[in-house]
């Protein structure tokens, strides 16, 4: 959702750019990369400090991989062979440390709060064991389709099922990402959930089409700055129309994650999909969803939940974002009620962005009665359907798992059962 997977508690990193290089002795022992965990309550943020020499100067930059932030320039206050002090002035942050037993033993400070922070040499290895590796036992086809109404050409990957036979017509699923422009793999923090889903479904006899969002990757054209969910829905509608035009498939369905779940129900109400998989899709009006999201994240982060619908609307009105203004006014109830095709709606009970108790409950109540519908809540899964501890977005990049194997199996089994 429009936490955009970037609504992280501002302990450290707003994307700022400060100039600041230190002219130092080029033999300093602290050159290189240092990393560690900043722990605040139940939260833990990975920080990486880079000290790189160039032309007699040392450039100091910070990364916060768990927040998707890299290359943030820091100002050097002091640097020697055994100690340093760096500052990011615009957010009131400093880090002072001394070399001790091969580690930087120091203190992180921001706006009056001080926290011990130990950094060790090197950058932590990012492990993503579920990311599929070639060779694949199935065919991938690069395709494009066109949304004429918005002059957008969408580029994507059509993945055929393993052992595909032209005499058969397998089910096919269009994969639609959440909010914010993303590539066809819905990539974030090194995770590629849509690639993992496409690979798994191909091995279970199901085809998929995943595509780069408009003006992202190889997709070109289409308004982005002033676009709303309704505009992105037309991109997905063009994808469904393209799949039907191939005349190679049986059921043509749509799997939407987060905002993509809203798009799935919008198209379901228009009877353009044969089935829907809603991964953490909204079930309530946008302003209610985002207020609940904000309050839960504040509470889990140790702050008092103080957001109200009125306060949220006042804050967002100042930003004048067409996307957010459309979203906070959008109530999915009518689209969900008018969706007649089979629906599999799922959420994790640790989802902090689209809260299961609020949204999945609403979807269950609004769906038309059908034995083919399935509504399921998974224990200990977050918004990305990873097994997690708190569910906070700051955990997404720290977790090696991309998506729960149980979720993958349930999606494939449910789609395949529709043929019976």
Where do the model's predicted regions map?
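Short beta-strand/loop motif that positions the catalytic acidic residue
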Residues: 339, 345-347
């Amino acid at each position: 959702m429009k936490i955009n997977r970037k609504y992280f508690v501002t302990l450290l990193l707003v994307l700022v750019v400060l100039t600041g290089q230190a002219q130092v002795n080029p033999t300093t022992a602290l050159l290189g990369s240092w990393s560690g965990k900043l722990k605040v309550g139940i939260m833990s943020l990975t920080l990486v400090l880079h000290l790189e020499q160039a032309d007699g100067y040392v450039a100091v930059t910070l990364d916060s991989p768990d927040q998707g932030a890299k290359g943030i320039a820091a100002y050097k206050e002091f640097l020697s062979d055994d100690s340093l002090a760096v500052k990011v002035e615009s957010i009131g942050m400093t880090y002072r440390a001394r070399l001790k037993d091969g580690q930087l033993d120091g203190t992180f400070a921001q706006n009056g709060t001080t926290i011990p922070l130990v950094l060790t040499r090197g950058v932590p290895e990012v492990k993503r064991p579920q990311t599929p590796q070639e060779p694949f036992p199935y065919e991938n086809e690069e395709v494009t389709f066109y949304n004429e109404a918005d002059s957008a050409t969408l580029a994507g990957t059509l993945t055929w099922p393993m052992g595909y036979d032209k005499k058969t017509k397998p089910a096919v699923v269009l994969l639609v990402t959440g909010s914010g422009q993303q590539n066809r793999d819905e990539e974030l923090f090194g995770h590629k959930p849509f690639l993992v889903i496409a690979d798994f479904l191909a091995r279970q006899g199901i085809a998929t089409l995943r595509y780069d969002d408009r003006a992202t990757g190889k997709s070109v054209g289409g308004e982005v700055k002033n676009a709303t969910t309704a505009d992105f829905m037309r991109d997905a509608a063009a994808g469904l129309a393209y799949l039907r035009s191939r005349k190679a498939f049986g059921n043509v369905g749509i799997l939407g994650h987060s905002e993509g779940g809203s798009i799935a129900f919008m198209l379901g109400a228009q009877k353009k999909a044969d089935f829907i998989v809603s991964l953490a899709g909204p079930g309530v009006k946008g302003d209610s969803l985002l207020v609940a999201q904000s309050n839960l994240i504040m509470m889990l982060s140790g702050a008092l939940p103080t957001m109200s619908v009125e306060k949220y609307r006042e804050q967002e009105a100042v930003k004048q974002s067409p996307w957010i203004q459309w979203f906070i006014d959008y109530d999915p109830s009518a689209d969900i009620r008018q969706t007649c095709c089979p629906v599999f709606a799922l959420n994790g009970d640790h989802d902090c962005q689209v809260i299961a108790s609020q949204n999945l409950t609403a979807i269950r109540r609004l769906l038309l009665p059908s034995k083919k519908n399935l509504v399921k809540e998974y224990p200990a899964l977050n918004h990305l359907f990873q097994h997690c501890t708190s569910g906070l977005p700051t955990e997404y990049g720290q977790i090696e798992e991309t998506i729960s194997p149980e979720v993958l199996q349930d999606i494939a089994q449910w789609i395949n059962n529709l043929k019976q």
